Amino acid sequence: VGSEEEINDWCSQGKVEMQATGGRPLEVSAPQYFFFNAPYVMKDFEHFTRVWNGPLGKKAKEQVEKNGKQIYVGIVYRGLRQMTSNVPIYTPAEVYKMKLRLPTVKTWIAVWKGLGAEPVPIPLPDLYKSLKEGKADASEGDLTQISSFKLNEVQSHLTMTNHLVQTGGILINSGFFKKLAKKDQGLIL
């Protein structure tokens, strides 16, 4: 149907009523709260949930509704993100000059650049091919992604970095939501 970026924009515009997505709504509509999706900030899902359900999470959700015209219906835990490569990675210094495949998430790119890696934004459908052809030396993702993409066929090492508590958001366009009957709104929230 469209990329994550396009679907997020369409949901903000009311062209799509609901979406299941990653951190794009925060990145676009509440960038000051993007730390919720930044590497090495949250130690586990319980920690994430405590902060998300607290005052900072409330402010982040309010900003997404105000600026992005979307309401968070829920959060889905997608696992901890790990790294794959063809060389062992024991310390952050070993990612120096490594071409690391990343999604087009500004915060993630900035963090990995700060660690000395050379981020290569590659769409997820091209992940396997990019590693096989050497366009990227390494990748990062949750274990389900690593397994389902069969990255063991093109990468010899898996490093359990747990560098990001990966969550996904389920959001509804606020204009669409407000037009629903109160009982239907209650079913959604």
Predicted regions and their residues:
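N-terminal secretory/targeting leader peptides
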Residues: 1-48, 55-189
